[in-house]
């Protein structure tokens, strides 16, 4: 594994939690600027979710929800990953996504579910975030 020390290696990629609170778009830009090819994290296998959840629980300082790279760009429940990978795995929290009040188009890991399940949230909300990179 070629991941730097405080990054989580998984399936050829490296993941890191950042505790700085940012709006979703600013978090995605931060990941992209960190290193070319980095994005907010995308998930594709059931097995990735618990491993990442455990990593976040161990390293996340604070109670904030955590942005991942899923969003509803067209605002019609057609969810897309910022790294343009295939949306083949979704693990929503109960009664989600709901586009509550027609305002929630970005996806966060819910702290009350141990960061295992997802919720759609207002993109301007300030959250911690999870970057995914190749090193």
Swiss-Prot record:
<keyword id="KW-1015">Disulfide bond</keyword>
<dbReference type="GO" id="GO:0005576">
    <property type="term" value="C:extracellular region"/>
</dbReference>
<dbReference type="InterPro" id="IPR016186">
    <property type="entry name" value="C-type_lectin-like/link_sf"/>
</dbReference>
<keyword id="KW-0479">Metal-binding</keyword>
<feature type="domain" description="C-type lectin">
    <location>
        <begin position="10"/>
        <end position="132"/>
    </location>
</feature>
<feature type="disulfide bond">
    <location>
        <begin position="31"/>
        <end position="131"/>
    </location>
</feature>
<feature type="short sequence motif" description="Galactose-binding">
    <location>
        <begin position="96"/>
        <end position="98"/>
    </location>
</feature>
<dbReference type="Pfam" id="PF00059">
    <property type="entry name" value="Lectin_C"/>
</dbReference>
<feature type="binding site">
    <location>
        <position position="104"/>
    </location>
    <ligand>
        <name>Ca(2+)</name>
    </ligand>
</feature>
<keyword id="KW-0106">Calcium</keyword>
<comment type="similarity">
    <text>Belongs to the true venom lectin family.</text>
</comment>
<dbReference type="InterPro" id="IPR018378">
    <property type="entry name" value="C-type_lectin_CS"/>
</dbReference>
<feature type="disulfide bond">
    <location>
        <begin position="106"/>
        <end position="123"/>
    </location>
</feature>
<feature type="binding site">
    <location>
        <position position="119"/>
    </location>
    <ligand>
        <name>Ca(2+)</name>
    </ligand>
</feature>
<comment type="function">
    <text>Lectin that shows calcium-dependent hemagglutination activity but does not induce platelet aggregation in the presence or absence of calcium ions and vWF. Does not inhibit platelet aggregation induced by botrocetin and vWF.</text>
</comment>
<dbReference type="InterPro" id="IPR050111">
    <property type="entry name" value="C-type_lectin/snaclec_domain"/>
</dbReference>
<dbReference type="GO" id="GO:0046872">
    <property type="term" value="F:metal ion binding"/>
</dbReference>
<feature type="disulfide bond">
    <location>
        <begin position="38"/>
        <end position="133"/>
    </location>
</feature>
<dbReference type="GO" id="GO:0030246">
    <property type="term" value="F:carbohydrate binding"/>
</dbReference>
<feature type="disulfide bond">
    <location>
        <begin position="3"/>
        <end position="14"/>
    </location>
</feature>
<feature type="binding site">
    <location>
        <position position="98"/>
    </location>
    <ligand>
        <name>Ca(2+)</name>
    </ligand>
</feature>
<dbReference type="InterPro" id="IPR016187">
    <property type="entry name" value="CTDL_fold"/>
</dbReference>
<keyword id="KW-0430">Lectin</keyword>
<dbReference type="InterPro" id="IPR001304">
    <property type="entry name" value="C-type_lectin-like"/>
</dbReference>
<feature type="binding site">
    <location>
        <position position="96"/>
    </location>
    <ligand>
        <name>Ca(2+)</name>
    </ligand>
</feature>
<protein>
    <recommendedName>
        <fullName>C-type lectin BjL</fullName>
    </recommendedName>
</protein>
<keyword id="KW-0964">Secreted</keyword>
<feature type="binding site">
    <location>
        <position position="120"/>
    </location>
    <ligand>
        <name>Ca(2+)</name>
    </ligand>
</feature>
<comment type="subunit">
    <text>Homodimer; disulfide-linked.</text>
</comment>
<keyword id="KW-0348">Hemagglutinin</keyword>
């Amino acid at each position: 594994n070629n991941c730097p020390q405080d990054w989580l290696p998984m399936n050829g990629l490296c993941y890191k939690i950042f505790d700085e609170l940012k709006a979703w778009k600013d978090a995605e830009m931060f990941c992209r600027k960190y290193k070319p090819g980095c994005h907010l994290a995308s998930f594709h296998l059931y097995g990735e979710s618990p491993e990442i959840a455990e990593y976040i629980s161990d390293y996340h300082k604070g109670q904030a929800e955590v942005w991942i790279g899923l969003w509803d760009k067209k605002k019609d429940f057609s969810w897309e990953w910022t790294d343009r990978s295939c949306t083949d795995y979704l693990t929503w929290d109960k009664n989600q996504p709901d586009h509550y009040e027609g305002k929630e188009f970005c996806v966060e890991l819910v702290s009350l579910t141990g960061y295992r399940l997802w919720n759609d949230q207002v993109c301007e909300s300030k959250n911690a975030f999870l970057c995914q990179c190749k090193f």
